[in-house]
Curated annotation (Swiss-Prot):
Modified residues (Phosphothreonine): T227
Family the entry assigns: Belongs to the eIF-2-beta/eIF-5 family.
PROSITE patterns from the UniProt entry: W2
Record gene name: EIF5
Residue span of region Disordered: 143-216
UniProt cross-references to PANTHER family, sorted A to Z: EUKARYOTIC TRANSLATION INITIATION FACTOR, EUKARYOTIC TRANSLATION INITIATION FACTOR 5
Residue numbers bearing the Phosphoserine modification: S10, S229, S389, S390, S410, S419
Protein name (database record): Eukaryotic translation initiation factor 5
Pfam families, per database record: eIF-5_eIF-2B, W2
UniProt feature, compositional bias: Pro residues: 178-193
Length: 431
């Protein structure tokens, strides 16, 4: 039976599957051990050597591990249940397999033993970063890098040269049954011109339209998108800059008002949709931000609707705008937040969470704190309104119960309940 590689995803049609871990306990007493029967298959699904998850179990359990690569036996000392190991495998997948950006298990590890670093690159979204090497398993990985690691490039080049030499030799022998006599020692026999052309053809084949079309037929639709878009191979900062130039150009051309769909499509193409509000605030907002919130509400709503991450970037963008127009905007923070809240660009939870911690990532620490101090009246109002609404919900539940029971009662009783509801509504508005 197969399970999702990322078990936090409950979709039964999730494309990334792996076999469920099968563990077999062998031996007795001090010699008891757990053999992971299908570790090779599990590791293949994760695109990692089978020694990595086995060693991870040993690190987490404080147990010794044994690897019998020839017989495909991977052993953890002690008695351990399969379900326990399966849950522990989720930790390994999260730390060493899933991409931190898109959470897809399409990553490769790049080990540099000299610098003692382990890089991580994602083939799905183009993410590149470094792993935290504090885990004990990282020491094992640095000593035993995977075969596809950059540390093995020298070995690969040698194999490539050897292959190339063999191809030349095979080509020269195939022309006749007996090889030609060797040239005199003082003469150098250059390779025939036809062979050079063949080699050039081999190297140039990748760039021809026919070769590209043939390769495109062999790869999946998802990989097609990545291959066709070179921009996805760039860093996040470069992709955000591309989006910034795109939005700025639309504004300069005077078509920004009707370009909301195009801007969202471009952000999705670059895989930086959550950061879209940060770009929009920089291009579209100035000291007249309160008027501009209403004018460009549709643009921001396409990014921020039901997207808390995008809403957080909108708040960070607001901080940047305040930093540029501090004299005009610092006193208007509560009103600006209220405008954004009323426009459904921000949710209560996101605003309250933002107000609790000042960050110096986008503006200075002092300004970030000052902005939050100025926002306190609105935050206080927001919290009080939330408490009142929760209290009102409880009252509504009681009223609903009254109405349900009043169906069995006489008509005058139902009318009385309705009149009470109206009075309650008036009281809530007054509050």
């Amino acid at each position: 039976m197969s399970v999702n590689v990322n078990r936090s995803v409950s979709d039964q049609f999730y494309r990334y599957k792996m076999p469920r871990l099968i563990a077999k306990v062998e031996g007795k007493g001090n010699g008891i051990k757990t053999v992971i029967v299908n570790m090779v298959d599990v590791a293949k699904a994760l695109n990692r050597p089978p020694t990595y998850p086995t060693k991870y179990f040993g690190c987490e359990l404080g147990a010794q591990t044994q690897f019998d690569v020839k017989n495909d036996r991977y052993i953890v000392n002690g008695s351990h249940e399969a379900n326990k190991l399966q849950d522990m495998l989720d930790g390994f997948i999260k730390k060493f397999v899933l991409c931190p950006e898109c959470e897809n298990p399409e990553t490769d590890l790049h080990v540099n033993p000299k610098k003692q670093t382990i890089g991580n690159s994602c083939k799905a979204c183009g993410y590149r970063g470094m792993l935290d090497t504090h885990h004990k398993l990282c020491t094992f990985i640095l000593k035993n890098p995977p075969e596809n690691s950059d540390s093995g490039t020298g070995k690969k080049e040698k194999e490539k040269k050897n292959r190339k030499g063999k191809d030349k030799e095979n080509g020269s022998v195939s022309s006749s049954e007996t090889p030609p006599p060797p040239p005199p020692p003082n003469e150098i026999n250059p390779p025939p011109h036809t062979m050079e052309e063949e080699e050039d053809d081999d190297w140039g084949e990748d760039t021809t339209e026919e070769a590209q079309r043939r390769r495109m037929d062999e790869i999946s639709d998802h990989a097609k998108v990545l291959t066709l878009s070179d921009d996805l191979e760039r860093t996040i900062e470069e992709r955000v800059n591309i989006l910034f130039d795109f939005v700025k150009k639309k504004k300069e051309e005077g078509v920004i008002d009707s370009s909301d769909k195009e801007i969202v499509a471009e952000a999705e193409r670059l895989d930086v949709k959550a950061m879209g509000p940060l770009v929009l605030t920089e291009v579209l907002f100035n000291e007249k931000i309160r008027e501009q919130i209403k004018k460009y509400r549709r643009h921001f709503l396409r990014f921020c609707h039901n997207n808390k991450k995008a809403q957080r970037y909108l708040l960070h963008g607001l901080e940047c705008v305040v930093a540029m127009h501090q004299a005009q905007l610092i006193s208007k923070i509560p009103h600006i937040l209220k405008e954004m809240y009323d426009a459904d660009l921000l949710e209560e939870e996101v605003i309250i969470s933002w107000s609790e911690k000042a960050s110096k990532k986008y503006v200075s620490k002092e300004l970030a704190k000052e902005i939050r101090v100025k926002a306190e009246p609105f935050i206080k109002w927001l919290k009080e309104a939330e408490e009142e609404s929760s209290g009102g919900e409880e009252e509504d539940e009681d009223e609903n119960i009254e109405v349900v029971y009043s169906k069995a009662a006489s008509v005058p009783k139902v009318e009385t309940v309705k009149s009470d509801n109206k009075d309650d509504d008036i009281d809530i508005d007054a509050i």
